[in-house]
C-alpha cells in the first residue's frame, strides 16, 4: 500500500501534470465526518515543474487552472458564484497553507 506522500506525488502528476522537488506535510483530517472513516492528508508541494499534460486518467475529466496565490480566494468565490462545484477540501487546504505563509506568499520564519 502506498503512503499518503506517495499518493500525493502520484495524484499531483496524474491530475495536474506537475511534479514537485519538495513536499511539506500540513495535516490529516476526515474527508466526510459521520459518513465515512476515510482520511485525507494535505501536503504543500514546492518547486513545481510541468512534466506531463495532466487532466487525470481513464474517465477523469480534470481541467487544470493556474491561478496566482494572491488571486485564488477571489477566483474560487467567482467560481462558486457562477454555480460551479468547488470541493470544500480546496478551501481547507488553502486555509492551512495561509497559516504557514505570510501575506507575500513566502513561508514565515
Question: Can you annotate each of these PLM segments?
Answer:
Residues 1-10, 14, 48, 58, ...:
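Conserved Nudix-box catalytic region and its N-terminal flanking loop in Nudix hydrolases
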Residues 5, 41, 65:
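Residues that recognize and position ribonucleotide moieties
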Residues 13, 17-51, 78:
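Active-site segment of metal-dependent pyrophosphate-handling enzymes
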Residues 25, 33, 50, 59-109:
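Nudix hydrolase/Nudix homology domain
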Residues 54-55:
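Acidic/polar active-site rim loop that often engages polyanionic ligands
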Amino acid at each position: 500500500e502506498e503512503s499518503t506522500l506517495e499518493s500525493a506525488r502520484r495524484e499531483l502528476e496524474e491530475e495536474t501534470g506537475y511534479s514537485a522537488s519538495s513536499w511539506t506535510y500540513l495535516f490529516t483530517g476526515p474527508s466526510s465526518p459521520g459518513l465515512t472513516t476515510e482520511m485525507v492528508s494535505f501536503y504543500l508541494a514546492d518547486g513545481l515543474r510541468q512534466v506531463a499534460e495532466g487532466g487525470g486518467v481513464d474517465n477523469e475529466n480534470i481541467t487544470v487552472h493556474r491561478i496566482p496565490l494572491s488571486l485564488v480566494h477571489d477566483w474560487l468565490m467567482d467560481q462558486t458564484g457562477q454555480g460551479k462545484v468547488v470541493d470544500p477540501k480546496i478551501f481547507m487546504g488553502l486555509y492551512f497553507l495561509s497559516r504557514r505563509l505570510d501575506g507575500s506568499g513566502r513561508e514565515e520564519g
